[in-house]
Amino acid sequence: MVQASSHAESGHEGKQGASRSVGLLVAAVGVVYGDIGTSPLYTLKEVFTGGYGVSVNHDGVLGILSLILWSLLWVVSFKYVMFILRADNQGEGGTMALTALARRATAAYPRLRTLMVICGLIGASLFYGDSMITPAVSVLSAVEGVGLAFDGIDHWVVPISLVVLVALFLVQRHGTEKIGKLFGPIMVTWFLALGALGVHGISQSPEVLKAFNPAWAVNFFVVHPGIGVAILGAVVLALTGAEALYADMGHFGRKPIARAWFILVLPALVLNYFGQGALLLQNPEAARNPFYLLAPGWALLPLVGLATMATVIASQAVISGAFSLTRQAIQLGYIPRMQIQHTSSDEQGQIYIGAVNWTLMVGVVLLVIGFESSGALAAAYGVAVTGTMLITTVLVSAVMLLLWKWPPLLAVPILVGFLLVDGLFFAANVPKIAQGGAFPVLAGGVLYLLMSTWKRGKQILVERIDEGALPLPLFISSIRIQPPHRVEGTAVFLTARSDAVPHALLHNMLHNQVLHSQVVLLTVVSEDRPRVPEHERFEVEAYGDGFFRVLLHFGFMDEPDVPAALKLCHLDGLDFTPMRTTYFLSRETVIASRLEGMSRWRGNLFAFLLKNANGNLRFFNLPLNRVIELGTQVEI
């Protein structure tokens, strides 16, 4: 009986495990694969109607299909699934997590470390540009199907797209926890529809399956030497969203993402592209919109509805990714602090950042109004995508060689292969900068300027403050000689340096002539890892005479809740009772000058960013009625 019971229990646990695995797989399909899953809407259309000069004939179609297939296999299956997904930072992925790893890998090489940081900032900047382009091009391409269903309403495509997109941004502050549960099933339905349409098309012209032979891709370059590299600028559209596999790894883990790719997403994409190719072999005129023309007439409107839902889900994933990237960048010190609102009581990762949301919305609206069609936007899309892919390869190269210590004989050939393919895709998109691709470059340039100015400005600010800092041991010695009046309670002074006296403490002594019975010099340390366990959260050191030094460590995915963290600090004589604890903050006002370190115009820009950044009070969740803020002026 006991044996039977244990078998029943293990069987039940096995079913639960299988159910959880399927649930994770479906959820991953809904979040991770929305972008790459909607690429069939516009990729082949752009290849054959984008002015590349590719003929819609037997060799041209098979050559392009072979290029798309082997690009998916090399870039997504081999590079991202088999290699990049292994470069996790304690389970987290994405540009900032990878930059943190690369910083750690190059710690012994200062110049190389600086280069890795620059690459990471450029990659993050391009991602924000991509976060504007993806919603615009995806929703436009879906709504364009309405023009095929009803004659004479093409002029409604832009207004309908704008309504859908603006509504999407307006609901962000309320979160997507409830409707988010539908994303997975909807996207699974979408991929099944892609596969079914593809099978329908292939059955009409099975010879299209010859494109599985890579010789057709090689032959295309031989026959079309003039446009061979240029056409990669359109082929790369089939790879848009590949970066999401890595960026969203922290939500689902490597295995569910990999399984979803090989079991459902890759087969559905390949079938659909080949189905569209089969249609083009039969009817070259279908190149104007091969995706929708592949569907039977009765299925067109339902397909437009399903495509619109899929593109909205893809857009939601990119917007959420921008919120997550911003939080990581804030924690790592690359972006000014902003108001972060949690939209779910259960999921810590579901956040809303108003400044990012409204900036993205304005960018998306301007893109839709300015470009008016998905085809016109395709040029801008490729630059952002290929730039991000190339930078990811550069960062992971440092990690593989310097952190993982892979043997160069094994790592270098693989990395050279990645860099060669990424470099070709990027080079193919460089000429598009003059055709609309300037947008992500300009947007990325502006964002890089802001992030680099903030990072450098904060470094100079700390240096200037440190120049006149009083060493803590000297201050404590003077206190012993001339003891000031002490009052009951704990005073917590936030400071970037733990070995010097904070300006706020000196100002408090100067104006109030008193000290609290307990004085805590608190330094918050941002780690290059996503989370710091509670037992590693704090370091405490007693200096005597009621002075303590406390270091709090937070990862870039942690919530920097200082009062909650201080409750974990256990040391005799240290008391953080809320109503007996007062937090003293220093508020710096920056004055741009001609001092070395930063040009005056960048100094003014930094001063503007600092003035509008969220202060320590909200960022560290300090109690409003227990905070005293003291100001100081600093020249940079």
Swiss-Prot record:
Annotated keywords: Cell inner membrane, Cell membrane, Ion transport, Membrane, Potassium, Potassium transport, Symport, Transmembrane, Transmembrane helix, Transport
Organism: Pseudomonas putida (strain ATCC 47054 / DSM 6125 / CFBP 8728 / NCIMB 11950 / KT2440)
Keyword match Ion transport: yes
InterPro entries (UniProt xref): K+_transporter, K_trans_C, K_trans_N, Kup
Subcellular location field: Cell inner membrane
Topology relative to the membrane: Multi-pass membrane protein
Broad class of where this protein is predominantly found: membrane
Family matches, as Pfam families: K_trans, K_trans_C
GO-annotated cellular components: plasma membrane
Reactions listed under catalytic activity: K(+)(in) + H(+)(in) = K(+)(out) + H(+)(out)
Role description: Transport of potassium into the cell. Likely operates as a K(+):H(+) symporter.
This protein's name: Probable potassium transport system protein Kup
GO molecular function, one term: symporter activity
Family: Belongs to the HAK/KUP transporter (TC 2.A.72) family.
Membrane spanning stretches: 22-42, 64-84, 115-135, 150-170, 182-202, 220-240, 261-281, 293-313, 351-371, 383-403, 408-428, 433-453
Source species, domain of life: Bacteria
